[in-house]
Design a protein with these regions (language model features):
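The feature captures the beta-strand-to-loop junction immediately N-terminal to the Walker
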Residues: 35-37
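Glycine/charge-rich catalytic "coupling/switch" loops of P-loop NTPases
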Residues: 252-295
Length: 308
């Protein structure tokens, strides 16, 4: 069974095209990311899935049941979804414990309040109000509240964007653990490619035209990007243009092997930083000589491997 199926979805706001023929599927109990730059229509797509906006063209199915089309709109409260907004939307007049209990009062939940309190990791803050919590603590409470009613589908809109780097990594780890433990189908909107690769089983990359340009597992998109847009979404690359002769192209960093189908054509080659190896030894046959002009430390773009 598919948790979500989006078919030919298009949407306009004030006659401006926001979504353009969007199609994708989410398998049951899996995690998908909608990845794209600001203004690509990610949040609009999430609102349409949630039923917060009406569909103009196309179809949305949840658990194989149509919930939205141009002629049908199932109210949000009947879709069995959880929604975590960017600003968390906690009830300011309720304590942490009361916020967590609120969904249970209206739905039959497989969770009990004590089950979810362990996940929140705030045993000393249950009687505090949201304004007394840090941003990370509020995020934990909001996430737990969205899951406690055991929705069929969980929608997270940029859940980590307001957190500082160190706290973001900690909360992201906790979130992934909770999502895997709860087995809830989840769609996460983000503009951070590394975040998407870490937390999801499937990534759907959107462009500024409101279209999904490529979908697939993180490794597939990283290793086999469909075009330059997808390639550069996962980090900066060294770009070289040239003509293919004898199944190779000559670049400033050496000869690059190219598929024979590009013979005698002008092509663009993208090389990630980790694809270039430096050595003080004599230049190999396919290499080239150069001089290191500067070295700077920014951030890690290579996988971190823990050896035990």
């Amino acid at each position: 069974m598919l948790a979500v199926s989006i078919k030919n979805l298009s949407h306009k706001i004030n006659n401006k095209s926001i979504l353009n023929n969007v199609n994708f599927e989410l398998k049951k109990d899996s995690i998908a990311c909608i990845l794209g730059p600001s203004g690509s229509g990610k949040t609009t797509l999430l609102k349409l899935i949630a039923g917060l906006d009406n569909v103009q063209n196309g179809h949305i199915l949840i658990n194989d049941q149509e919930v939205s089309s141009a002629n049908k709109h199932l109210p949000t409260e009947k879709r069995r979804i959880g929604f975590l907004f960017q600003d968390y939307a906690l009830f300011p007049h309720l304590t942490v414990k009361e916020n967590l209990k609120y969904p249970i009062n209206f739905k039959n939940s497989i969770y009990k309040i004590d089950d979810i309190i362990d996940v929140v990791k705030l045993p000393d803050s249950l009687d505090k109000y949201p304004h007394e919590l840090s941003g990370g603590e509020q995020q934990r409470v909001a996430l737990a509240r969205s899951i406690i009613s055991h929705p069929d589908l969980l929608l997270l809109d940029e859940p980590f964007s307001s957190l500082d780097l160190n706290l973001r990594e900690e909360i992201r780890d906790d979130t992934l653990h909770l999502l895997q433990k709860s087995n809830v189908s989840t769609i996460i909107v983000t503009h951070d490619p590394f975040e998407a690769m870490f937390i999801s089983n499937q990534i759907n990359i959107m462009d500024n035209n409101g279209s999904i340009v490529q979908s697939g597992p993180p490794a597939e998109l990283y290793n086999n990007p469909k075009n330059q847009y997808v390639t550069r979404f996962f980090g900066e690359t060294n770009v070289f243009n040239g003509d293919v002769h004898n199944s190779s192209i000559k670049t400033p960093v050496g000869q690059i092997k190219v598929d024979q189908k590009y013979e005698n054509k002008n092509v663009t080659v993208h090389i990630r930083p980790q694809g270039i190896k430096l050595s003080e030894q004599p230049t190999p046959v396919n290499g080239t000589k150069g001089t290191v002009m500067a070295v700077s430390y920014t951030h890690l773009t290579l996988p971190t491997i823990l050896l035990v």
